[in-house]
A protein has these predicted regions:
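Short, membrane-interfacial amphipathic segments enriched in basic
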Residues: 2-34
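Selective transmembrane-helix segments that form parts of the transport pathway or gating/packing helices
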Residues: 42, 46, 50, 89, ...
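Active-site cofactor/substrate anionic-group-binding motifs, chiefly glycine-
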Residues: 41-93, 97
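Short cytoplasmic-facing helical segments at TM-TM junctions of multi-pass membrane proteins
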Residues: 110-135
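Hydrophobic alpha-helical segments embedded in or immediately adjacent to the lipid bilayer
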Residues: 134-178, 197
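Hydrophobic alpha-helical transmembrane segments of polytopic membrane proteins
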Residues: 176-211
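Conserved small/polar residues in nucleotide/adenosyl-binding loops
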Residues: 214-215
Length: 215
């Protein structure tokens, strides 16, 4: 029976994700491989995350600040920027960046290994390819996605504060007070939601990228 390619990819992703998560719960994790993948998905993609965070914070802040300043409520700029970034922009843009920088590298690595029959060789050596190749990469994405998301949020707020002060004469103390305790301010639930979203995005992205091992 013929099955569409997208259906095969979906089934492959579900299978590989389930197997990898099973190995994680059993504690079958190579620390050396995990550390190597953390270096690739962390410091290896840090620069692009920081640059995009600065750009996003600048653009978002200029749009928000211009409207709020014209209405005479420039003291709320920081809070609106923080909430908008934490709830939607930071996890979404971070996931997009991690997809382009890290997930594509994972897919290319496993695709090359499959074409050159390295995965079959690993299996013949009685090493489980899911445990050896997938688990470290999956965990690295799950661990580094929220960390990168927090860095993205921090940089975007810092960038927004600088431009608010330069263009709209908003004192830094007013900006950061708005972030912490304004009418619209950043709360622990916003941060928790952002972390959960980034973890889920990291899990989904890595499973899809690593499903090539079964295709």
């Amino acid at each position: 029976m013929y099955y569409p390619k997208f259906f095969k990819r979906l089934v492959s992703s579900l299978i590989i994700g389930g197997q990898a998560i099973n190995y994680v719960f059993k504690g079958k994790i190579s620390r050396n491989d995990l550390f190597e993948q953390l270096m690739e998905s962390g410091p290896g993609s840090l620069l692009i995350v920081l640059i995009t965070g600065i750009a996003a914070g600048t653009v978002f802040n200029i749009q928000v600040a211009s409207q709020l300043t014209s209405m005479g409520v420039s003291s709320e700029i920081g809070g609106l920027l923080a909430v908008g970034m934490a709830r939607e922009m930071a996890p979404l843009l971070t996931a997009t960046l991690m997809t382009g920088k890290v997930a594509t590298a994972y897919a290319a690595q496993l695709g090359t290994m499959k074409v050159t029959e390295q995965i079959e060789a690993i299996t013949m050596l009685r090493t489980e390819p899911i445990q050896y190749l997938v688990v470290p990469r999956l965990l690295s994405m799950i661990i580094m996605s929220p960390i990168q998301c927090l860095l993205f949020l921090s940089v975007s707020l810092w960038s927004g504060q600088i431009w608010s002060t330069i263009f709209y004469n908003v004192p830094p103390i007013v900006f950061w007070t708005s972030v912490r305790s304004g009418n619209v301010s950043l709360t622990s639930s916003d941060l928790s939601s952002m972390i959960i979203k980034s973890v889920v995005f990291g899990l989904i992205i890595s499973i899809i990228a690593l499903s090539l091992i079964h295709i």
